[in-house]
Curated annotation (Swiss-Prot):
Keyword entries, A-Z: Cytoplasm, Elongation factor, GTP-binding, Nucleotide-binding, Protein biosynthesis
Compartments, record wording: Cytoplasm
Native source organism of the sequence: Hydrogenovibrio crunogenus (strain DSM 25203 / XCL-2) (Thiomicrospira crunogena)
Gene Ontology CC terms: cytoplasm
Taxon lineage: Bacteria, Pseudomonadati, Pseudomonadota, Gammaproteobacteria, Thiotrichales
Protein name: Elongation factor G
PROSITE patterns named in the record: G_TR_1, G_TR_2
Function: Catalyzes the GTP-dependent ribosomal translocation step during translation elongation. During this step, the ribosome changes from the pre-translocational (PRE) to the post-translocational (POST) state as the newly formed A-site-bound peptidyl-tRNA and P-site-bound deacylated tRNA move to the P and E sites, respectively. Catalyzes the coordinated movement of the two tRNA molecules, the mRNA and conformational changes in the ribosome.
A Pfam family matched in the record: EFG_III
Family: Belongs to the TRAFAC class translation factor GTPase superfamily. Classic translation factor GTPase family. EF-G/EF-2 subfamily.
Keyword Protein biosynthesis in annotation: yes
Length: 700
């Protein structure tokens, strides 16, 4: 079966933004204008089709990235039909993992900014993630009808806060309640959308007289940006002082795809203005799968390889989301980078080294689905029947194995103990947590060996609240949760030599293992390193693996307070063995003893997670907010003026941030907002370390 739409006409885009920049409403309007959803769903009344999990509708925030396929031929039907796959991404800071994994499989992104608050803290976080994956972006300044709306102000913030180069492609006509339409700077025409038919109809008119000069000034800047794309355009621009419409679009497209500029658009999704022109811009300026560099991977023998976006290369895809569906079981969302996959055919999961069979392939529309026979390079689809595949795995042709670049997931920073309300639900809770952990790699489940409690860990309080909530809704398991626990770490400050000796003689065959280590601190974030410096066989080669494993296990279990020990180098420099009594277990135990002995002399310290906190507050509460942050051992790093008052940035230990949202609301009568992201691990002050160690020794 041949392709219906050539790959050049595909666009895989994400819509990313801070909470309340109107991202879900923008997506809804896109679905409406592309003819997929007939009644526009409003986030205000919990009806948006992209927000398809019940909690999202209640909380009015978007949690899971749903993938949707739509088609568009332009506002004036000026293009052949293009296929747009939209991945909706959450804007709440506890769900950055969702954003991270959707960015991984996108070719381009539309970033929504609020016309009043502009670049907010989460916009910066998401922007940095998009930089990491080299995703081309364009901006949509939404909510132009709100009091305080200012398009050019937001452009300036994109320069100042994100260090990017925005290029306005439109200017708004009016703002706040007088916002009526936009000026298209390429065509130099005003566009007005009719309110009666929800913006389905529009008119092109002359630019209002009082705006002509401003539009000419900004058009000049836009043409100049386009000319910088290549020498040919620059020569023509220098000779003639202008470029044709086609040349402007070609130049802007090239620079946008090369991540040099951010074309900027504006509108009000809620008032049905500007979204249709934004869709045209997606087709004109966002890359097709064939425009982005080939994806890199590794073959079985470790050699580097790449896969191009074409049906002729072997099949290779990345699973970027796993979900449990009550009717069909496990759904695996995947992006195909090369080749073709037919329903019912076998695939190879090269990360898990397992063959699997794809039962059915579904094309997803945010909450309805259509079954398809095959899926081709550049497409995003959903597989039913994959049992062992989790987020970030590569699926490929069993005869042409490859591992695509892996996704990186952050370590959780907060843990809570959880137990079912009734003993009968114990098994059900285990199954539910296992399924939720398969869906979300930033959520972990483990059993505490000493207390036998189930511990769940995640990226923030809201993240874990929603997990508990989903267990109740989707799996009918009600749970009690304990107080949140911080994920501390341990490390050392100086190098020492230490030995570990395990000898047991109790009649018959004994046990004997003896190692000498040099234990040294490493740079923050560099992890564990094991060096084997044995010469002359003081420890036989077959036991080296057991020594490394024993050392690593002891470090993971911690030494001073039971927290994982990080950034340590362990060098095996000497040891001894017994011809009869030595075995792997004895050396593993000896290694653990060596680590314990060494660490206690190596100035061990406890590290605590420190969060980057940003509070936006009306000016009159600034003193109270700063005072409260100082009481929480916070270090205020900056205070900036913003449209709604002040923005305060601070670094605060996570252990001091529990219950912060309630305290902040009471200090500011609910008028302040904050966001919090993990920043780094720092040495905890000595009094705090003593408390933590005392608690650990009591077994609390």
């Amino acid at each position: 079966m041949a392709r219906k739409t050539p790959i050049e006409r595909y666009r895989n885009i994400g819509i990313m933004a801070h909470i309340d920049a109107g991202k879900t409403t923008t997506t809804e309007r896109i679905l409406f204008y592309t003819g997929v959803s007939h009644k526009i769903g409003e986030v205000h009344d919990g009806g948006a089709t992209m927000d398809w999990m019940e909690q999202e509708q209640e909380r009015g925030i978007t949690i899971t990235s749903a993938a949707t396929t739509t088609h568009w031929s332009g506002m004036a039907q000026q293009f052949p039909e293009h296929r747009i796959n939209i991945i909706d991404t959450p804007g709440h800071v506890d769900f950055t993992i969702e954003v991270e994994r959707s960015l991984r499989v996108l070719d381009g992104a539309v970033t929504c900014f609020c016309s009043v608050s502009g670049v907010e803290p989460q916009s910066e976080t998401v922007w940095r993630q998009a930089d990491k994956y080299g995703v081309p972006r364009m901006g949509f300044v939404n909510k132009m009808d709100r009091a305080g709306a200012n398009f050019l102000n937001v452009n300036q913030m994109v320069i100042d806060r994100l260090g990017a180069l925005p290029v306005p492609m439109q200017l708004p006509i009016g703002a706040e309640e007088t916002f009526r339409g936009v000026v298209d700077l390429v065509k130099m025409k005003a566009i007005y959308w009719e309110e009666e038919n929800m913006g389905m109809k529009y008119t092109y008119e002359d630019i209002p007289e009082d705006m002509v000069e401003l539009c000419e000034e900004w058009r000049e800047k836009m043409v100049e940006s386009a000319a910088e794309a290549n020498e040919e355009l620059m020569d023509k621009y220098l000779e003639e002082g202008d470029l044709s419409e086609e040349e402007i679009k070609a130049g802007i497209r090239q620079r946008c795809i090369d991540v040099e500029i951010v074309p900027m658009f504006c509108g009000s999704a809620f008032k049905n203005k500007g979204v249709q022109a934004l869709l045209d811009a997606v087709i004109e300026y966002m890359p097709a799968p064939s425009d982005v560099p080939a994806i890199q991977g590794e073959l079985e023998d470790g050699t580097k390889a790449e896969r191009h976006s074409t049906d002729d290369e072997p099949f290779a895809a990345l699973a970027f989301k796993v979900m449990t569906d009550p009717y069909v079981g496990t759904l695996t969302f995947f992006r195909v980078y090369s080749g073709v996959l037919s329903a019912g055919s076998p695939v190879y999961n090269s990360v898990k080294s397992k063959r699997e069979r794809v039962g059915r392939i579904l094309q997803m529309h945010s909450n309805s689905r259509e079954e398809i026979k095959e899926v081709r390079a550049g497409e995003i689809a959903c597989a039913v029947g994959l049992k062992d595949t989790t987020t970030g795995d590569t699926l490929c042709d069993p005869d042409n194995k490859i591992i695509l670049e892996r996704m990186e997931f952050p370590e959780p920073v907060i843990s809570i103990a959880i137990e079912p309300k009734t003993k009968a639900d114990q098994e059900k809770m285990g199954i539910a947590l296992q399924k939720l952990a398969a869906e979300d790699p930033s959520f972990r489940v483990k059993t505490d060996e000493e207390t036998n409690q189930t511990i769940i860990s995640g990226m923030g309080e809201l993240h874990l609240d929603i997990i508990v909530d989903r267990m109740k809704r989707e799996f009918n398991v009600e749970a009690n949760i304990g107080a949140p626990q911080v994920s501390y770490r341990e490390t050392i400050k100086k190098s020492v030599e230490a030995d570990g000796k395990f000898v047991r003689q109790s009649g018959g065959r004994g046990q004997y293992g003896h190692v000498v280590f040099k234990i040294s601190p490493r740079e923050a974030g560099s992890g564990f390193e094991f060096i084997n410096s044995i010469v002359g066989g003081a420890v036989p080669r077959e036991y080296i693996g057991a020594v490394e494993k024993g050392a690593q296990q002891q470090l993971e279990n911690g030494v001073i307070a039971g927290f994982p020990m990080v950034d340590v180098s362990v060098e095996l420099i000497d040891g001894s063995y017994h011809d009869v009594d030595s075995n792997e277990m004895a050396f593993s135990v000896a290694a653990g003893m060596g680590i314990k002995n060494g660490v206690t002399q190596a100035s061990p310290v406890i590290l605590e997670p420190v969060m980057a906190v940003e509070v936006t507050t009306p000016e009159e509460y600034m003193g109270d907010i700063i005072g409260d942050l100082n009481r929480r051992r916070g270090m205020v790093s900056s205070m900036d003026d913003i449209a709604s008052g002040k923005s305060i940035k601070a670094e605060v230990p996570l252990s001091e941030m529990f219950g912060y949202s309630n305290q902040m609301r009471s200090l500011t009568q609910g008028r302040a907002n904050y966001s919090m992201t993990f920043l780094k691990y720092n040495d905890a002050p000595s009094n705090i370390q003593e408390e933590i160690i005392a608690k650990a020794q009591k077994g609390e």
